[in-house]
């Protein structure tokens, strides 16, 4: 049975969301077992079977629109029409039955919806995209006001495991000096709290209903894939859609 995480947040009627783990698939080590990424060296047949299992377990209404994630800040608006390019790190939809999805294996997945249950979005926020403003870009796609938007921070590398160089801290502080509170000195490096950085960025644009942000992909090795921990590994995915 594919093990899914159902976000704990006050979802409005008409919105559904879930996030995958590494449990319940058919892939062999080091992709064991519910690897959803077709780009990381796994057997394509295994990936296809894993996706089928996930879609069934999550009761997805259609195949997700998979993005070509590039650690940027572009948002793809899902219209149901053919896309000239899927190079983006977030997707937005106001169409029922269209599934927004992002893949991660340490980077932060963020799911959005508005209280009225008419708009949703999914974001892949690695530190580069987060620093560049992918969350702000996504919020700006919503017709609704930021105060009516809810955000869920999915499983990412935790604050005790995410070691970065001084240049990462400096990049965030160049945008917002308050970001310094999310970094703790660790030898000649820093430990970064990607959840705190995301909360700061969201609060800065008026999104204050923020949930999740309490898991660690790096330390919870039985449950999650982690690129930083294992290098060659699988990918989880987070999904949200209008019913």
UniProtKB/Swiss-Prot annotation:
Keyword line: Copper, Hydrolase, Metal-binding, Oxidoreductase, Transferase, Zinc
Annotated Zn(2+) binding sites: 71, 107, 124
Molecular function GO labels: adenosine deaminase activity; copper ion binding; oxidoreductase activity; S-methyl-5-thioadenosine phosphorylase activity
Catalytically driven reaction(s): adenosine + phosphate = alpha-D-ribose 1-phosphate + adenine; S-methyl-5'-thioadenosine + phosphate = 5-(methylsulfanyl)-alpha-D-ribose 1-phosphate + adenine; inosine + phosphate = alpha-D-ribose 1-phosphate + hypoxanthine; adenosine + H2O + H(+) = inosine + NH4(+)
E.C. designation(s): 2.4.2.1, 3.5.4.4, 2.4.2.28
Matching CDD domains: YfiH (cd16833)
Names of the cofactor(s): Zn(2+)
Function field: Purine nucleoside enzyme that catalyzes the phosphorolysis of adenosine and inosine nucleosides, yielding D-ribose 1-phosphate and the respective free bases, adenine and hypoxanthine. Also catalyzes the phosphorolysis of S-methyl-5'-thioadenosine into adenine and S-methyl-5-thio-alpha-D-ribose 1-phosphate. Also has adenosine deaminase activity.
Family the entry assigns: Belongs to the purine nucleoside phosphorylase YfiH/LACC1 family.
Protein name (database record): Purine nucleoside phosphorylase YfiH
Organism: Shigella flexneri
Lineage of the organism: Bacteria, Pseudomonadati, Pseudomonadota, Gammaproteobacteria, Enterobacterales
């Amino acid at each position: 049975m594919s093990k899914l995480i159902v976000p704990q947040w006050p979802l409005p009627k008409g919105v559904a969301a879930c996030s995958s783990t590494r449990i319940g698939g058919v892939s062999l080590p080091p992709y064991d077992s519910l690897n959803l990424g077709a780009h990381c060296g796994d057997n394509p047949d295994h990936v296809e079977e894993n996706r089928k299992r996930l879609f069934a377990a999550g009761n997805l209404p259609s195949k997700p629109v998979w993005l070509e994630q590039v650690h940027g800040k572009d948002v793809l608006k899902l219209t149901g029409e053919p896309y000239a390019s899927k190079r983006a790190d977030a997707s937005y939809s106001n169409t029922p039955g269209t599934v927004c999805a992002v893949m991660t294996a340490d980077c932060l997945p963020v799911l959005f919806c508005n209280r009225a249950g008419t708009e949703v979005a999914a974001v892949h926020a690695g530190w580069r995209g987060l620093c560049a403003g992918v969350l702000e870009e996504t919020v700006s796609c919503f017709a609704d006001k930021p105060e009516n938007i809810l955000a869920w921070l999915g499983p990412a590398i935790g604050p005790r495991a995410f070691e970065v160089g001084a240049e990462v801290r400096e990049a965030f502080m160049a945008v917002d000096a308050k970001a310094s509170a999310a970094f703790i000195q660790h030898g000649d490096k820093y430990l970064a709290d990607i959840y705190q950085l995301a909360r700061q960025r969201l609060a800065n644009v008026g999104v204050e209903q923020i949930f999740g942000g309490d898991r660690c992909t790096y330390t919870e090795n039985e449950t999650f894939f982690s690129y930083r921990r294992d290098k060659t590994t699988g990918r989880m995915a987070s999904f949200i859609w209008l019913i």
